[in-house]
Every structure is written in structure tokens, then in C-alpha cells.
Amino acid sequence: MFSILLRLSLVTKIFIAIILGFVVAFLFPNMTPYFSIFGEIFIKALKAVAPILVFVLVISSIANFNVEQSAKNFKPILFLYIVSMLFAAFSAVIADLLFPTTLVLASSADQAFQPPGSLNDVLKNLILSFVSNPVVALSEANFIGILAWAIILGTAFRHSTQATKTVLQDCADAIGKVIHLVISFAPIGIFGLVAVTFAHSGIETLKSYSHLLLVLLGTMFFMALIVNPIMVACVIKKNPYPLVFKCLRESGITAFFTRSSAANIPVNLDLARRCGVDESTSNVIIPLGSTVNMCGAAITITVLTLATVNTLGISVDIWTMLILCVVASISACGASGVAGGSLLLVPVACSLFGISSDIAMQVVAIGMVISVLQDSTETALNSSTDVLFVIAVDQASKT
């Protein structure tokens, strides 16, 4: 029996854990305190690895970033990737304004934090976080400071020897294995979190989860079926939907089940080849897109951050939301290197509003509960968009 469980996929294990959590919460609510330790350990582990994860991955990604100068159409495709992520984050902001989401957080009222009072406070906190001591930033989980120092060091390491870059990549791979180990215990942690949360809050929690999931998926579908086609139409000057549906059908469906943009690269390369894209372009741009083009991740980060803000009663003006869009887009670029995807980068955006790491990691755990659908749909959007823009720009350049 135990060996059969070990052979199951992580998604299946999480699904089983959620069901068991429901059963324990509603049939044996008095037993849930005994299981709370599982959720607490899981959140503690996430909090422990997240700062060093972001720091090492960003340094390694920037230091090893390499684009062949011969790659055709690089600039317009990269421009579409950037604009797409910004539009995705902005769409998530609009979705939150139309359908505001709140979450059920454990002991959120007990958390002491000082939310920013205005845009000036946000900008001041942002600038001060940038110049924070890197060691202090890591120890206090100041993700803005971590991101700033990682970008600076990564840029500096670009001029180092190949051996140094290889060491950085090896460090990133090692951290990735640690994250994989932590995530492998997600079913046990989620079981404890679901059992305790539903035993205390009941059906209201289920309503908040379903509403959050609908907002996330609705925004992703809006991006895939409305925003992306408009962008493609502006490029190819004709009906974009045949190409959009082709990419969703041949790339998106595969990515939905693999839940990995990197694993879907061969599928995208084959699709680009069959659509007549020059291999000197597709072989460079599509792997790059699987790393930096993360519009689905930008949506997830923005929606979850604003849901946290709504839950804590923090007032946010439109200018702060626009800053959040930029931060979410930048954070999303690092999502491909994280086993938990965009979820583990939510604390970066939450730190804009003075939200503590404790609360942010509770939100990450909530995201993992709905990740069976959220992460699959997010990956499908990310990967299909990678190849969509490559084919669109290639077609436009040939007309």
C-alpha cells in the first residue's frame, strides 16, 4: 500500500491529502489539533528555503543568461513577452477590483505589521528595501532587498569565468533539489492545513477557495482568449484565432498535464518547426521564453497578493497597484526555476505592503491547495504563449 502511494504523482497525492483533510475536519474535528503540526512544519520549511532560493536562482539566471546575437526577431518577441506579462498582471488587478477575494488565514489578526499609508510610503519602503544589507535581507526574508542584491551580483558575475558560472548553476541546481524535497512533503503539510482550517472555519473556507480559483482561472482564460489574440492581431494583421487555438491545442493541452514549461520545450520547438519558423530563431527564443515569459505566473502572484491585501484590510490606490504589476511581472520571470512555481514568489509582492513572511507563507499554502488546477492552467498559458508570439512575429516578418 505504501509503495503504491509513493509511485503516485505529486498532484494525485495532494488531491488525496485534500480529501483526507476534509474528512478529518468534518468527521473528527476534535482530532485536528494533533495534525496541525504537519502544516506548521511545512510552512516553516517554505519560509526557511524561500529567501536563499530567490537569491541563488536570480544570480545564476542572470550570470548564465546568454542569447545568440544571430537569433532573428529576438527584440520584438522579447517585447511581446514583457508586454504580455504586464497586461496579465494588470488584468489580474482589474479582476480583483471586479471580484474582490478574501482568504481565511490562521491567526491573521494576531500578526503585527505596519501597512503603508500612501504611494509615497510604498516607494520609500521599496527604495529602503533595495539598499538593505544583503545578510539582513536574507535573515529577515526581505525579498525586495534579496531581489535587488541578486540582480546586482548576477550582473557582476556575467563578466566572470565560465567555471564560476558553472559553480553558480550547480548551486542553483542544489537549491532546486532542496526545494524539490520540501515540495515532496506538500501532501502531508496540506493535509494538516486543510484539516485544521476547515475544522475551525467550516464551509466559509471552501467558498473563499472556490472564489479565488475562479478569479485565477477566469483571468487566465481572459488572457489566453482575449488579450493574447489582440496582441497577435496587431502583429500579423489578420484573424489571430486560428493560430491562437492551434497553439492552445498543440502546446497548451500538453503543458496542462506536464505542469512544466521546460518539459514542454520539445513540443513547442516541433510546433514552431511545422509552422515554418527558422530553427536558428526557435532554438534560442523558445527555451528563453520558457524561462522569462510567465504571464500566468504574473496573474497568480498579483491575484494572491491582492487577496491577502483585501483580507488584511489594507487600502491600496491605483498607483500602488501599478507598481505591484511591475513587481509581479519581474518576480514571474523567476518562477520557472522554482519547484513551487509562482507561489513561492508571492512573498516578494506581499513585502510591498509590509505583509509579514508568516502571513505570506500561509497564502502560499492556500495556493498549493488549489494548485492542482491553478498550476496546470498557469503552465498551459505560459507555454502556449511562448510559441504563439514566436510564430506570430515570424509570420509578420515574412509578409
UniProtKB/Swiss-Prot annotation:
The species this protein was found in = Acinetobacter baylyi (strain ATCC 33305 / BD413 / ADP1)
Q: Identify its protein family.
A: Belongs to the dicarboxylate/amino acid:cation symporter (DAACS) (TC 2.A.23) family.
Known function: Involved in the import of serine and threonine into the cell, with the concomitant import of sodium (symport system).
Q: Which domain of life is it from?
A: Bacteria
* Residue stretches spanning the membrane: 8-28, 37-57, 77-97, 134-154, 178-198, 212-232, 284-304, 312-332, 348-370
Query: Subcellular location, in the record's words?
Result: Cell inner membrane
Report the record's Gene Ontology biological process terms: serine transport; threonine transport
Per the record, the gene is: sstT
Gene Ontology annotations for the cellular component aspect, listed alphabetically = plasma membrane
Alphabetically, the GO molecular function entries are:
amino acid transmembrane transporter activity; symporter activity
Stated name of the protein: Serine/threonine transporter SstT
Q: How does the record classify its membrane topology?
A: Multi-pass membrane protein
What does the UniProt keyword field contain? Amino-acid transport, Cell inner membrane, Cell membrane, Membrane, Symport, Transmembrane, Transmembrane helix, Transport
Catalytic activity annotated for this protein?
Answer: L-serine(in) + Na(+)(in) = L-serine(out) + Na(+)(out); L-threonine(in) + Na(+)(in) = L-threonine(out) + Na(+)(out)
